[in-house]
Amino acid sequence: MKIKNILPIAIMVLLPFGGGWMGMTSCVSDDTTLPTRPLSEINIDGGIEALYNINKNETLRIKPALSQTNQPKTVTYTWEVDQQVYSHEEEFTYPAKELGTFQCRLIVENEDGKTFFPFTVNVNSPYEEGIALLSQQPDGTSMLSFMLTPSNGGPRSFTTGDCFSVNNPDLTFSPRCIDMVQSSGSLILACQGALPSASGAAQPVASSPSSGNGAAPTIYYLNEKTLVAENVVPVTEYDDFVPTRLVIPSVGASGVAYPILCENGSVYEFSTTEGAISKPTNFRYKYAQTCLAHDDGGAGWSFDLVFWDKEKGDLCDLYSGYGPYYCSTKYLLVRDSVNAQTNYFANNDIVKIVGIDLTAKQKRTDKSEMLILTKNAFLTRKTILSTGFWEYDASAGAAKLWDNGGTSTACIGTNIINEQTPCVANKTYYSLLFGDKNQVRRWNYATSQSLDKADVLQTFGSDRAIVTDLVLSADHLTTYVAFYEPDQTGLNGSVYVISTDTGEILERYDNVCYRPVKMIYKKK
């Protein structure tokens, strides 16, 4: 006699049992004749975890190991991501294209029942925090590299290939990248575009997927977590727009236009919220190729943008959108009032403007300062100024120029620093580190040490190597040094990490880029 048996639903928590996994088994309709046929239950024995952490652009692959309690039967697979069917393949292949947390489930079934395995995939940013680096090939082709600082303190390595092209496959990276800042959730990049030919037309660079043939000067907004371009601003309306410095604070404000310094000393203004380039309203003259953008990381309205006015021969500061005001013992001196008597730096030329970096602890108690190097004939002078020039003097009941006691001699004779020299200064060791050919030298700016007698802190590469950029760690204990070998082809750029105090080489990352042009430490 034929008897129809309905097997009960068995619900079990997913726990390891006897070397395998027990799951949830659905009810089965059994139309066989007596005696009852034994079921072949599915066990997930391994090859799959409850939690995965991967980085964007990585591919997760999962191939579970299965067993069946009785005679093996044909099984089918269903992979779900956020309650949507993703695949029916035996192996789960998941290219991580978006950041976030994704709830997933594996369903394996045969004719006797089903087994479920839920799991979570966290897709993290491979660009969360670390070194971002722009470099150029000899033909001008741009490249963006990144080295992640792992949260667990594990080993570090640079990405392979151009991060811009990887994350923006439909865009060409404009040639001759030159500067980069992190501001209000974005990495803002500046590229000078293709070199002009003798006829004035854009001169193409060698063809490659990222060469940007014939590209105009371009400003890019990249999402700081994904490096995906959120705004691309090609600039074709101004013939002399060849950017060299993005003078933009770390926090932008709506409605504020920030300066972009160009190769010929002119300045254009750029709205970070509107992505528009315009003629300047604040900096309308010619300026030296050394400047400073300083802010406290707070509100976007609190910043100092410091330039050297070449015609007036004086520093000027756009303070939180006001000014620019010129450096003088006279408070809030405007340009029309600058003369030999009011100009603090009268009869001097600029050598270098360097912000003096502070640790988080120092920022709570110390003034924000900058080191100013100027020259007059064979005499180089140093001045330590407040980034805002003036500080309130309670005893006088008024604002006074804060110049740390005034100007003093840095060196007599040949000056070994110029506007283009890579420099970093810190308050921890009261030292200025600067690149000099294939060396990093250290000058104790708070002492009477002559600048031309600065110590050699470390030497890099061959005798022909050139140091192009320096970046301090947040605690000042280490310094990142970017350099390249001009006689080498291909990836001829390297980054080393040294002790800021002793110069000892702590980490080496050889041949990770082309000629480095800009390096920053990208914060979370």
Show which residues each predicted segment covers.
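Short loop/turn segments that connect beta-strands within beta-propeller blades
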Residues: 150-151, 224-225, 273-274, 395, ...
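Beta-propeller domains
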Residues: 136-173, 191-229
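Short glycine/acidic-enriched loop and turn motifs that connect beta-strands
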Residues: 137-141, 194-198, 266, 312-314, ...
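Conserved blade-ending motifs and adjacent loop-strand segments that build the rim/top face
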Residues: 403-419, 451-475, 504-517
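C-terminal motif of bacterial Sec signal peptides marking the signal peptidase cleavage site
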Residues: 23-26
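Bacterial N-terminal signal peptides that target proteins for export
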Residues: 2-13
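Acidic, serine/threonine- and glycine-rich low-complexity intrinsically disordered segments
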Residues: 197, 205-436
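Acidic/polar, low-complexity intrinsically disordered N-terminal segments immediately downstream
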Residues: 4, 28-167, 190, 474-476, ...
